[in-house]
Amino acid sequence: MAAAAASAVNAVNDCFSIGSTVVCTTCFNEEVEGEVLAFDHNTKMLILKCRSKSTEELSDIYAMNLSLCSNVQVIKECNGNFDDPQKLNLEQVKMRLRKTVERRQDYLKSKNADVSPEAQELYRAIAKQYGYNEVSWQGLNIQILNEVTISPPYRVDNVVSSSNNETSCNYIKRIIKQFFNTRPSPVPESGAAASTSSPSVSPTSSSLASGSPVPAN
């Protein structure tokens, strides 16, 4: 990865310029296409103006670290005539960067190599309600508020409270029920009897869907 990134950076150092259109492939295999606004050779930071995903009236500004990109391609050279870029709101950029880093850190907290991807998704569903600082892995168990524990296989019957807090337990059980009820049914294996089918389950309405606050202890 490092060698590929280095070769990609070296390839564009002498050929792309401000106003050119570039496509960068990140280390997460995501492609970002945009117009070059600036490039710092020392830090290998490339600033791109990209089409906004939410509105055509605005543009998204991406700061790409080329040292972490697996590929960089110039798809359109600048014709030499381009408008000066607008001044960036540095405070807004710093705030967005901080939020992006926080989201990535929160996602990493949910990772556990010893449990299934489904268990990690359940962890994130619970953390969205309580906050990532209130949820943690204790071995194979999910611990919430340092008092409620969910053990494998992470169903309603596996919820235990060390302080007999029924309010928290019931709320967490509703999260678990909604999580599994809204997951797609497994695809039946080929050759299975046509008469065997799992009943469809519709999501249950609860305080989670309405965004009601977490009950206090």
UniProtKB/Swiss-Prot annotation:
Return the annotated region ranges for Disordered: 185-217
Alphabetical list of InterPro entries matching this protein: AD (IPR047574), Lsm12-like (IPR039683), LSM12_ABD (IPR019181), LSM12_LSM (IPR048478), Sm (IPR047575)
GO biological-process terms attached to the record: RNA metabolic process
Tree of life domain: Eukaryota
Q: Where are the transmembrane segments?
A: none
- Gene Ontology cellular component? nucleus
Q: What happens when the gene is disrupted?
A: RNAi-mediated knockdown in pigment dispersing factor (Pdf)-expressing clock neurons disrupts circadian locomotor rhythms, with mutants displaying long period locomotor rhythms under constant dark conditions. Enhances the period-lengthening phenotype of tyf mutants.
Name the CDD domains for this protein.
Answer: LSm12_N
Q: Where is the AD domain?
A: 86-184
| Domain Sm intervals | 9-78
**Which residue windows does the record flag with biased composition (Low complexity)?**
190-217
The GO terms describing molecular function are:
RNA binding
Subunit note: Component of the Atx2-tyf activator complex, composed of Atx2, tyf, pAbp, Lsm12a. Interacts with tyf, Atx2 and pAbp.
> What protein family is recorded?
Belongs to the LSM12 family.
Please give the name of this protein: LSM12 homolog A
